[in-house]
């Protein structure tokens, strides 16, 4: 496909984006808004953002959800801006500095919350800064400006949603159904690999792919939930399927690890059974029916606990899968599965990374303020706004440097494109609303195609071009003002990029160590006799941390294996019949406190000391378990956990 070619699958969204822009433009001028540009810009960003992230037309519900987040972020930012102005209107410099800190604070929060919701906080940060900068000449008009900005943004969002509904957005339901079938086959094939006990790298690749696919399925569930309320039952089932899929991965990998020391546990009966290849979900269904008969014949005692647990989870997966595909009423058996255990939320391991993002945003905004005050440039305020926008949006993504480069390319492309519209097209079409709408529709159509290709600079070019062309009411054509705005955007992006390069993010290793220690803490916390604590479902949170570890350290197999081993230890100890008595309960509470100290330790010396204390306590715990005559289901996992922690002691404690 050529660089300027147009694929058929890209046309519908390009028309949708053009329609959203035209609707916002028409409504803005029809209701005599002072700056219809904000409505048009909002419609373009809300519609194009999900398409750029997806690399194609977004699924149904994505644009609505992004619009909802934008409304929330705008209102939070407007309220914060009003509070800052009311409190500090007599000290303008201090007011701007507080706004810079507010933008940094919002970036800090957006780095810690779910990536889907971080957009609202990033927006809240720079909205307050936009309000404070814009009202500098006339502070008394602050409430009016805040109300107008909110109104224009809501109009833009409504127009984007109307355009999305008008062109029948894609439903993700069929993709979910296909992935459920395919994922079950992949789970069975992973178990086959683990029972064969072949090449470790092949097994590592297989379970790593399954972790990614399960995480992707969870993202599809979020999309389906946004799409329509009629998928509420399917959403409940998919949430339980996420845990079941992770359970299947855990049991398969434990089957592989058990054979490293005790290969005789997997009998020839099961080895021969899992030799039969499967290609479809129907093949897996037949094999599971046969496998349940084999287990009924051999008995639960003669069946390895990992295979028994795997079959139980796969059977539940199958039952819920049928319910998701048909979206029928939830029956009593499904309801029993769905009641399940409450999921546990873990503390973010990226606090240091979030603090780096705070300083990047705050320092870049302060640098923009100093540049504005030092030069006295009329468009210094525009540069400041772009600095806040770039840093607020870039920091929450995995590669902020590339986001900043995208904005630089976009603002550079917007200069000639905006010049064409400012000097030629808009002056010749402003007398006709139809011609004006057609001219902007053409811009939206072609940039909409490039956005779907994820072309570098396409998203920045769309937003920057709309921002600098004259879409005010009434239209005024001052070339110096246009040039200032265009250059202000470029300078702001370059300054933001400079700060991102200078304030380096060296938090990766620290985040990795915190994640690994959180796995250790989870394994230790499973040693409890508290019934409520044992019913807590840690699995989704643990695999979410594992997925983050895989993204932070791609290809680092030793780290992945260590994390997976800790997850397996957690699951095994959680189900182990630990003797119930006050002595063990008190000692396990002490061990959990020590594990928490390992995570929270700020220096290597403290971390080593607490980790050494944890190892000593694990040795004492093994002795106590022998005294209290704990069964092998308890002593063996504790012994394996202690051995793993001794082996990887330096990796878990040293910076």
Swiss-Prot record:
Record has Membrane as a keyword? yes
How far does the signal peptide extend, from start to end residue?
none
Q: Which residues lie on this side of the membrane: Cytoplasmic?
A: 34-37, 90-92, 142-151, 391-406, 452-458, 503-655
Give one GO biological process term.
carboxylic acid transport
Task: Show which residues sit on the Periplasmic side of the membrane.
Answer: 1-12, 59-68, 114-120, 173-369, 428-430, 480-481
The answer to whether the entry has keyword Heme is no
Q: Which Pfam family, an example, fits this chain?
A: FUSC
**Which terms in the Gene Ontology molecular function aspect does this entry carry?**
transmembrane transporter activity
Which keywords are on file for this protein? Cell inner membrane, Cell membrane, Membrane, Transmembrane, Transmembrane helix, Transport
Q: Name one GO cellular component term.
A: plasma membrane
Superkingdom of this protein's organism: Bacteria
Mind telling me which residue stretches traverse the membrane in this protein? 13-33, 38-58, 69-89, 93-113, 121-141, 152-172, 370-390, 407-427, 431-451, 459-479, 482-502
Induction details: Positively coregulated with aaeA and aaeX by AaeR.
Predominant localisation class:
membrane
Quote the subcellular location field of this record: Cell inner membrane
Q: In what way does this protein cross or attach to the membrane?
A: Multi-pass membrane protein
User: Sorted alphabetically, which InterPro entries does this protein's record hold?
Assistant: PHBA_efflux_AaeB/fusaric-R, PHBA_efflux_pump_AaeB
Instruction: Write out the function statement from the record.
Output: Forms an efflux pump with AaeA. Could function as a metabolic relief valve, allowing to eliminate certain compounds when they accumulate to high levels in the cell.
Q: Which family does it belong to?
A: Belongs to the aromatic acid exporter ArAE (TC 2.A.85) family.
Name-wise, this protein is: p-hydroxybenzoic acid efflux pump subunit AaeB
